[in-house]
């Protein structure tokens, strides 16, 4: 088993153990978009557990060094990506900035906070990737400011087809500490879910906008 797969399993177990991720295949959550989802993820909880927080920061730093060794700046997405970007930037001894979802309505009207420079090679840190829309908007804001965005690193990704398409269209790579497939496998091994639940979870991922998975 490769090092990255071991890391994926460690982070997945952390997220389950601290209940940053809930799996409810029989009592789905409703997302703001109206999608019925068997999973709810709140990676902000990782900040409250020092061991988990350190493993996340170390893991993000490892992925940045491995995939983006030329990085000159770490950018966090507001608000959930900011603390993880700060911790990773500290590990890597790199400058850090953060990107709001839209410019401030007062003051200087900044969307990007921090000292960014033209051509600065930047990696964007996000806590969670679902469709990829919000983090790609942050990438676009950085590009508009003159940064060279190398790619994105996140704690967790659902691995949804819509996200894969969005990143391919933006011509940006992304890497995650762990993912939906790894997490559901770890959940099954740990007894968090049963084999019938796993089938439902796999069906949802293939087409999250359909409610057919819930009827199975």
UniProtKB/Swiss-Prot annotation:
Q: What is its EC number?
A: 2.4.2.10
Q: What cofactors are annotated for this protein?
A: Mg(2+)
- Binding-site list for orotate: 130
Keywords of the record, alphabetical order, are: Glycosyltransferase, Magnesium, Pyrimidine biosynthesis, Transferase
GO MF terms here are: magnesium ion binding; orotate phosphoribosyltransferase activity
Write out the GO biological process terms: 'de novo' UMP biosynthetic process; pyrimidine nucleobase biosynthetic process; UMP biosynthetic process
Keyword Ribonucleoprotein part of the UniProt annotation: no
Q: In which pathway does it act?
A: Pyrimidine metabolism; UMP biosynthesis via de novo pathway; UMP from orotate: step 1/2
Q: Does the keyword Magnesium apply?
A: yes
At the top level, the lineage of the source is: Bacteria
Q: Which InterPro entries match?
A: OPRT (IPR023031), Or_phspho_trans_dom (IPR004467), PRibTrfase_dom (IPR000836), PRTase-like (IPR029057)
Q: Which residues bind 5-phospho-alpha-D-ribose 1-diphosphate?
A: 100, 104, 106, 126-134
Which reactions appear under catalytic activity for this entry?
A: orotidine 5'-phosphate + diphosphate = orotate + 5-phospho-alpha-D-ribose 1-diphosphate
Functionally, this protein is described as follows: Catalyzes the transfer of a ribosyl phosphate group from 5-phosphoribose 1-diphosphate to orotate, leading to the formation of orotidine monophosphate (OMP).
Q: How does it assemble?
A: Homodimer. Interacts with BrxC.
Q: What PANTHER family does this protein's entry cite?
A: OROTATE PHOSPHORIBOSYLTRANSFERASE, URIDINE 5'-MONOPHOSPHATE SYNTHASE
The entry's family comment says: Belongs to the purine/pyrimidine phosphoribosyltransferase family. PyrE subfamily.
Write the protein's name: Orotate phosphoribosyltransferase
Please name the source species: Bacillus subtilis (strain 168)
> What is the organism lineage in this UniProt record?
Bacteria, Bacillati, Bacillota, Bacilli, Bacillales
């Amino acid at each position: 088993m490769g090092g990255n797969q071991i890391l994926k399993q460690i982070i997945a177990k952390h997220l389950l153990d601290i209940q940053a991720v809930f799996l409810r295949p029989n009592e789905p959550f409703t997302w703001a978009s109206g999608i019925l989802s068997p999973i709810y993820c709140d990676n902000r909880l990782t900040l409250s557990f020092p061991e988990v927080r350190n493993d996340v920061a170390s893991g993000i730093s490892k992925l940045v060094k491995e995939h983006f060794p030329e990085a000159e700046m770490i950018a966090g997405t507001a608000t959930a990506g900011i603390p993880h970007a700060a911790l990773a930037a500290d590990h890597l001894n790199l400058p850090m900035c953060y990107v709001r979802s839209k410019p401030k309505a007062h003051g200087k009207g900044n969307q990007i906070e921090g000292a960014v420079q033209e051509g600065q090679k930047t990696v964007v840190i996000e806590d969670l990737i679902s469709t990829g829309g919000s983090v790609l908007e942050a990438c676009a804001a950085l590009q508009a400011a003159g940064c060279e965005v190398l790619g994105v690193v996140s704690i967790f990704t659902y691995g949804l087809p819509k996200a894969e398409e969005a990143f391919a269209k933006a011509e940006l790579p992304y890497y995650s500490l762990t993912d939906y497939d790894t997490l559901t496998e770890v959940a099954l091994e740990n007894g968090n879910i049963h084999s019938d639940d796993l089938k439902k979870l796999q069906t949802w991922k293939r087409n999250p906008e359909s409610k057919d998975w819930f009827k199975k």
